[in-house]
């Protein structure tokens, strides 16, 4: 009976650990998609506020808006290298760090050259997330929820675009001073980014990447947990 009781306790511990891992995988999948959408949709209802602060004009505003896509293309192209050499987990941490740090720097309203560099970096992070998050999910998420996680990532992109559009309009109407409104707009992204950045440290590494690196014991340990 004692042995049976111990077995039940071990089973409960394993079940609890499994639920925690699944929770964090779901959270990062959601945040990765959300941040993708937040940064993609940010410019739509913030450009007018940005122009009031930086006096960009139509052409300058268009150039600033396009920088994100440029960074995104380069980030996506280099994501395979990051995934291979850094691993999936550390690549996610890198993306979270870029999202959070560059959003915070942007909120300080730096010179336009620095702001543009931050937007390029945010695009770079979007490119990394767009490649790494689905890859990580395909290799790590439990088979029972793997398909749902891919759908969740796509859904959260759309939600992020909608959310930032509504949020920026509300912020601009509440805070009429653009020098106050614009930092708050950037800090909204920073808040979600910090959750992703910190949460990524708690994720298990991809078992496939561990196997590719010859770390078979660690890979089996991760597979046993998920």
Where are the regions that the model predicts?
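Transmembrane-helix signature of 12-pass secondary carriers
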Residues: 2-225
């Amino acid at each position: 009976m004692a042995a049976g009781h111990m077995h039940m306790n071990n089973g409960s511990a394993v079940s609890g650990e499994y639920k925690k891992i699944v929770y964090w995988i779901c959270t990062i999948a959601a945040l990765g998609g959300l941040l993708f959408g937040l940064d993609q949709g940010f410019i739509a209802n913030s450009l007018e506020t940005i122009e009031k602060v930086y006096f960009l004009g139509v052409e300058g505003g268009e150039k600033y808006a396009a920088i994100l896509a440029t960074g995104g293309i380069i980030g996506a192209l280099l994501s395979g290298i990051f995934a291979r050499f850094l691993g999936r987990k550390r690549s996610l941490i890198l993306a979270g760090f870029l999202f959070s740090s560059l959003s915070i720097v942007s909120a300080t309203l730096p010179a336009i050259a620095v702001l543009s560099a931050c937007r390029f970096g945010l695009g770079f992070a979007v490119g990394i997330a767009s490649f790494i998050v689905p890859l990580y999910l395909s290799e790590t998420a439990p088979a029972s929820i793997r398909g749902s996680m891919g759908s969740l990532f796509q859904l959260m992109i759309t939600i992020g675009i909608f959310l930032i559009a509504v949020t920026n309009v509300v912020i601009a109407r509440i805070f009429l001073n653009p020098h106050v409104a614009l930092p708050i707009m950037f800090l909204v992204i920073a808040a979600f980014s910090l959750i992703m950045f910190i949460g990524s440290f708690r994720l298990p590494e991809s078992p496939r990447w561990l196997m590719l690196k010859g770390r078979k014991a660690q890979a089996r340990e991760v597979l046993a947990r998920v």
